[in-house]
UniProtKB/Swiss-Prot annotation:
Keywords: Cytoplasm, DNA-binding, Repeat, Transcription, Transcription regulation. Belongs to the MraZ family. It is found in: Cytoplasm, Nucleoid. GO terms for molecular function: DNA-binding transcription factor activity; transcription cis-regulatory region binding. It comes from Methylibium petroleiphilum (strain ATCC BAA-1232 / LMG 22953 / PM1). The keyword Transcription regulation applies. This is Transcriptional regulator MraZ. GO terms for cellular component: cytoplasm; nucleoid.
Amino acid sequence: MAEIVFQGASALALDAKGRLAVPARHRDVLGALAQGRLTLTKHPVGCLLVFPRPAWEGFRDKVAALPLRAEGWKRIFLGNAMDVEIDASSRVLVSPELRQAAGLVKDVMLLGMGSHFELWDVQRYQAHEAEVMQQGLPESLGDFSF
């Protein structure tokens, strides 16, 4: 079976209870791949990481195996992880703690990042993207052909 790759951006809105409607193009894959089970946690750049449960388990195991000097990062990734399920209306509840950590209020952007997603506040994402673009290409992409 080919590796599942999530890609693309979806502009979405959180409802008053902090729920996010999963885009239709991802629902079937997430249902088949993870039975609608996801894990959300903090990302160091100020967004949230959203993993289908099988991808989370691999990530979690890598983080748990980090040396003691990375204990703080273990706390950030594992200590803030929340298991959620896609409900019958195709929504996911983002906890108040994680919404606050990522500055999520209403308008959000869900970005497919391969095996997982990033969930951003729209304005925070636009500022982050502008900053990245202003920095230019990193040296590691010097030989990359577009």
